[in-house]
Amino acid sequence: MTSLQPPGAGDLPPVRHVPDAAAHIRGYLRRTGRRLAVLDDDPTGSQAVHGVSVLTAPHPSGYANGLASPGDTCFVLTNSRSLDRAGAVAAHQAAARDLYTWEVGSGGTVEIVSRGDSTLRGHVTAEVDAVAAQRLASTGVATDGVLFCPAMLEAGRFTVGDTHFAVVDGVPTPVADTEFARDRTFGYTRSNLREFLAEQSGGAITAAEVASLSHDDIRTGGPQRVAEVLASLTHRRWVVVNAADHADLAVVALGLQLAQEAGRRFLV
């Protein structure tokens, strides 16, 4: 698919294609004994993937099957987008508690992904905070950084210059200027993702403290530069992932794995 780019953005660095990136990513997961548990706030997430297990409700008995082997991925449907903030926090906290309890007992590593809406509707920061707090309580492991990556390229949602866009009627449009931002429950006014996180968190996160993985970092610097940016994160600091091509996501995943190998811990 063609890389996405908003009008007037200027020339982005050329897309960086890493040979056999997918194989390297999968190989790392198997080699390090990692499993991916995706807490999905809406059933549409699991409908866009294949080759993974899906639990229609969080339950400890399902994890042994869904995460049986290193490299396995399991979607866990929390349906928390339909809940109020307190209910969403409770749902993610309970799922994370069971997953980290399973991790401790299995001897493997579970990497939890909080899967939300590519148009930014949902309990974004509250759910991640709940997972990070539960990880610390269950395993004693603190979260160094949180990667915020709402791109869904197949649907025309992408991020350039820290601003998130949705293609509407063929035109890339800042998401705050779309109908999605006028949602009665999850409305927002900011397209810049640093500013969005500040708005969505009620000021608990400031735009200035949010880091960024720019297209220059990703496409010019490659996985090593991505790892350097991620290694600088501490105390659960958020970082915006700029992505307009699947190759951008592959480079970020490879850089994330380099940072993990150096002992850093993240949520996505």
Task: Annotate the PLM regions.
Residues 6-70:
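N-terminal basic/disordered segments at the start of proteins
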Residues 57-67, 220-232, 253-258:
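A short, acidic, amphipathic alpha-helical segment used as a generic capping/interface helix at domain edges
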Residues 245-267:
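Long, internal scaffold/assembly segments composed of regular secondary structure
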Residues 1-15, 70-73, 79-86, 268:
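Active-site-proximal helix-loop elements at catalytic-domain edges
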Residues 47-52, 65-66, 85-89, 160, ...:
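Short, glycine/acidic-enriched capping/hinge loops at junctions between secondary-structure elements
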Residues 26-40, 70-72, 82-112, 116-249:
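Cap/lid and interdomain-hinge subdomains that line or gate substrate/regulatory clefts
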Residues 38-40, 44-45, 254-255, 266-268:
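N-terminal low-complexity or amphipathic/hydrophobic leaders
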Residues 1-2, 53, 58, 82-84, ...:
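Long, low-complexity, Lys/Arg-enriched
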